[in-house]
Design a protein with these regions (language model features):
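Conserved C-terminal structural/oligomerization subdomain of aldehyde/semialdehyde dehydrogenase
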Residues: 3, 33, 317-456
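N-terminal Rossmann-like NAD(P)+-binding subdomain of aldehyde/semialdehyde dehydrogenases
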Residues: 2-107, 135, 275
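Carboxylate- and glycine-rich phosphate/diphosphate-binding segment that chelates Mg2+/Mn2+
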Residues: 267, 612-723
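ALDH superfamily catalytic-core signature
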Residues: 5, 12-14, 130, 206-334, ...
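Glycine/threonine-rich beta-strand-loop-alpha-helix active-site module
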Residues: 93, 158, 530-644
Length: 885
């Protein structure tokens, strides 16, 4: 027996026939999806050409079958659907790679959606049946049409014209299909089985499309309100409205449904309407037409697309056969007023408004009750920008047309050439739609974005000038007079340095150059916002063109904050202190600095590196809030590193600041944002600290040791100013804040624990940064070890020796091993542990750490640092284990 082949019924009038048709179309679409752009464009052009040539017979068919509209206008619609749509998209890429940027590693690839279900309205049957298949062909989709029962013949005929031309040009057979005997059940089936729905029709049909469970591109009802402002060109306005409202007897959904005219020009507007052949209904006639517009609360289908005279006759009114529009002068914009509804015919409501605001209020109500999201129009002198902006702000419509006939203007590319041509006009969320623009080819493709991994642009930012060497301060300051010609200098320092004559060399040099100066020396060890504000107030009175901040990190930080407040008195520290993941992508834009004053930083200790960093910390003593500011606008313009200013630093300061330098360099080297530039600075700083910190600690008068430690501090500062720090500093910041330990000591107490933590080859989470490809911190630490002469069989062995060498360094400078040894009360430490941990996790430094921390892991580091490695009490371990579960 011969095998029975599946056949597709020639007439689609049953669910079974439709199922077979859809299956065949999906197979055709799979073939079509492989076509090149050149093949598609050939098909697109052939189909558009055929539709254009058939525009007149198709227009005749539409009027004959539906009994609506005007043949000549439908010819224009068909012509528009073919020619304008082709012209708009002939050069648009819709196949394969449509966009590529090799520099940024982005490629966009267009793919067809599949099978489109197209619901076609009775008002624009042939033009819509040209438009939708054309954009489907351009996007390599199959399209199956569900025609309106009252327009099925002409709709199918239009689709056939497009299909036959497409197939002849190489398209797969059956790429366009239709239901021959349309019904609600078959339409629902089409919508369920298609991949996307293009729904144009009444509110019920559009709602069904959105309720089908498939993506839908539908439109909402139009109730276009027009306002004629008293500045408008009356002849232009009236004749544009007539031109639009009479086009195809008002069946374009964007056509005007009401016109609101300002009282001052109402009479002239009315006269122009009359002169151009419109008819104003008398009071008794108004009531008759009202009863004709709506039947049982719904639009009377019999008036749709009919001539004005025909509608008048239906209402029992006699008007000239040449009457263009029936105009009803009404007052209410409420839905109880029949004239306030969409009428899809040459029937127009006309309102009078005393003011422009009243006109807008009427238009708003008309849109809200019947045309949310669709179209509105305004006739006005375009120099009236304020009125135009007010109108645009008030109208919840996706098309706001200025001095434009709304039927022809709304569909696009006729009166504005950036509004894309379409016969499916999206109304946005206001109209219950998924799109708020004219639907086109971009809505019928899926775009795949291929994103190649790219690494961030990195940078090296330093002060414009860095001067260093013992005794260089007065020489560097020469530039203020000889090069920059500064006139007034403001010095910022603390009281100890001022009273002990540290600023005298600066003051003497300024006097020698004839530069007027003053000194603010009330900076506290933990600089406060109050003292910074006081300093800034003094600056504003003195009006310096140069600021010199001299001291440790506190004085330099305070100087930076005063600089900000001096140049930007309204600076918001809450915003400036916002955390960031990438300093170049932060939400807050720092104010540009340097407009009023040049900033010079002069360190008196070897530790913070603040003279070359874009960081500052300020505390609001009234609230206890610390604001850590970070932005390259805070980078000093000049740094002067003169060892003469550091020779008398006591042992405690030398120890704490020296180990801070080591921590800066270690964290900068391990940071995810480390680069070849910062690596060199960090490694050299580490070598110098190992070699010279013990000497500087043992003998403060050792000039060579002091000089090298000053250089190490500055280089480590440059390194972490660009590579940033990590959780070592996050933990130390909070340890110091909660338990009042010197910052450098706090860093030292967690240092070895953090290094072990970061060196894990299998971390719970690695940090996120494109340059950081995989956990390799152990190898980085081993590189540091080898750079200072350590050897071993593997990275782990070298790392262990590095830890040992660091411990020996800290022992040499007499840093204790645990937090507990510094007298921090155990009970209070444990009470603050959770809060400390959370704040450390949220610290700005955490983001660049190579291992992204869990809070439980940070807590464990704190406990190890308090009790010592391996000395955490068993009771505490059990408690932590229980809380972690």
């Amino acid at each position: 027996m011969a095998k029975k082949e599946n056949t597709i019924p020639t007439i689609i009038d049953t669910p079974e026939a439709l199922t077979a048709k859809i299956a065949a179309m999906k197979e055709a679409q799979k073939i079509f999806a492989t076509f090149t752009q050149e093949q598609v464009d050939k098909i697109f052009k052939a189909a558009a050409t055929a539709a254009d040539k058939a525009r007149i017979p198709l227009a005749k068919d539409a009027v004959e079958e539906t009994g609506m509209g005007i043949v000549e206008d439908k010819v224009i619609k068909n012509h528009y659907a073919a020619e304008y749509v082709y012209n708009a998209y002939k050069n648009t890429r819709t196949c394969g790679v449509i966009e590529e940027d090799t520099a940024y590693g982005i490629k966009k690839i267009a793919e067809p959606i599949g099978l489109i279900a197209a619901v076609i309205p009775t008002t624009n049957p042939t033009s819509t049946a040209i438009f939708k298949p054309l954009i489907a062909l351009k996007t390599r989709n199959a399209i199956i049409i569900s025609p309106h029962p009252r327009a099925k013949k002409c709709t199918i005929e239009a689709a056939k014209v497009v299909l036959e031309a497409a197939v002849e040009a190489g398209a797969p057979k059956g790429i366009i299909g239709w239901i021959d005997v349309p019904s609600l059940d078959l339409t629902n089936q089409v919508m369920r089985e298609a991949d996307i729905i293009l729904a144009t029709g009444g509110p019920g049909m559009v709602k069904a499309a959105y309720s089908s469970g498939k993506p839908a591109l539908g439109v909402g009802p139009g109730n276009t309100p027009v306002i004629i402002d008293d500045s408008a060109d009356i002849r232009l306005a009236v004749n544009s409205i007539i031109h639009s409202k009479t086009f195809d007897n008002g069946m374009i959904c964007a056509s005007e449904q009401s016109v609101t005219v300002l009282e001052s020009i109402y009479k002239k507007v009315k006269e122009e309407f009359l002169y151009r052949g419109c008819y104003f209904l008398k009071p008794d006639e108004l009531e008759k037409v009202r009863k004709t517009i709506l039947i049982n609360g719904a639009l009377n289908a019999k008036i749709v697309g009919q001539k004005a005279a025909t509608i008048a006759e239906m209402a029992g009114i006699t008007v000239s056969p040449e009457t263009k529009i029936l105009i009803g002068e009404v007052e209410s914009v409420d839905i109880s007023e029949e004239f306030a509804h969409e009428k899809l015919s040459p029937v127009l409501a006309m309102y009078k408004a005393k003011t422009f605001d009243e006109a807008i209020a009427k238009a708003e109500q008309l849109v809200a009750d019947g045309g949310y999201g669709h179209t509105s129009a305004l006739y006005i002198d375009t120099r009236e920008k304020e009125k135009m902006e007010k109108h645009a702000a008030a109208m919840k419509t996706c098309r706001i047309l200025i001095n434009t006939p709304s039927s022809q203007g709304g569909i696009g590319d006729l009166y504005n050439f950036k509004l894309v041509p379409s016969l499916t006009l999206g109304c946005g969320s206001w109209g219950g739609n998924s799109v708020s623009e004219n639907v086109g080819v971009k809505h019928l493709i899926n775009i795949k974005t291929v994103a190649e991994r790219r690494e961030n642009m990195l940078w090296i930012r330093t002060p414009e000038k860095v001067y260093f060497k013992k005794g260089c301060l007065p020489v560097a300051l020469d530039e203020l007079g000889t090069v920059m010609h500064k006139k007034r200098c403001f010095i910022v320092t603390d009281s100890f340095l001022y009273k002990n004559g540290y600023t005298k060399k600066i003051e003497d040099k300024l006097d020698q150059m004839g530069i007027v100066h003053t000194c603010f020396y009330d900076v506290e060890p933990d600089p406060s916002l109050a003292s910074a504000r006081a300093g800034a107030a003094a600056m504003r009175m003195f009006e310096p063109d140069c600021i010199i901040a001299m001291g440790g990190g506190s004085a330099m930080d305070a100087g930076k904050i005063m600089w900000v407040l001096y140049e930007n008195p309204d600076a918001n520290f809450d915003d400036m202190a916002m955390d960031f993941m990438d300093i170049r992508k932060r939400i807050f834009t720092f104010p540009h600095m340097g407009k009023k004053a040049y900033f010079i930083a002069v360190p008196t200790s070897s530790g913070t590196g603040s003279e070359v960093t874009p960081f500052a910390i300020i505390t609001d003593k009234t609230t206890g809030i610390k604001w850590p500011l970070a932005d390259y606008e805070l980078m000093p313009d000049m740094a002067i590193v003169d060892t003469d200013n550091m020779m008398s630093a006591p042992k405690g300061l030398t120890c704490a600041s020296g180990i801070d330098v080591m921590t800066h360099a270690l964290e900068a080297y391990a940071s995810m944002m480390a680069s070849d530039y910062t690596d060199g600075l960090a490694l050299n700083a580490i070598k110098l600290v190992f070699n010279y910190l013990p000497r500087a600690y043992k003998d403060g008068s050792d000039v060579e040791a002091r000089q090298h430690m000053a250089n190490a501090s500055c280089m480590a500062g440059m390194a972490f100013a660009n590579a940033f720090l990590g959780v070592n500093h996050s933990l130390a910041h909070k340890l110091g804040a909660f338990h009042h330990l010197p910052h450098g000591i706090a860093n030292a107490l967690v240092l070895l624990h953090v290094l072990r933590y970061n060196a894990a080859e299998v971390p719970a989470k690695m940090g996120t940064f494109p340059q950081y490809q995989y956990p390799h911190t152990l190898a980085r630490y081993a590189e540091i070890g080898r750079s200072v002469g350590l050897t071993g069989k593997n990275d782990s062995e070298v790392f262990e020796k590095l830890l040992q060498k660091l411990q020996e360094l800290m022992d040499t400078i007499e840093i204790k091993h645990t937090i507990k040894e510094y007298g921090v009360d155990e009970k209070y430490f444990l009470e603050t542990l959770d809060e400390m941990t959370e704040q450390a996790f949220n610290d700005q430094c955490t983001g660049a750490n190579p291992r992204y921390p869990l809070m439980s892991e940070l807590k464990e580091i704190y406990l190890k640092a308090y009790y010592g490695e391996g000395n955490i009490p068993e009771s505490r371990k059990a408690k932590e284990k229980k809380e972690t579960k």
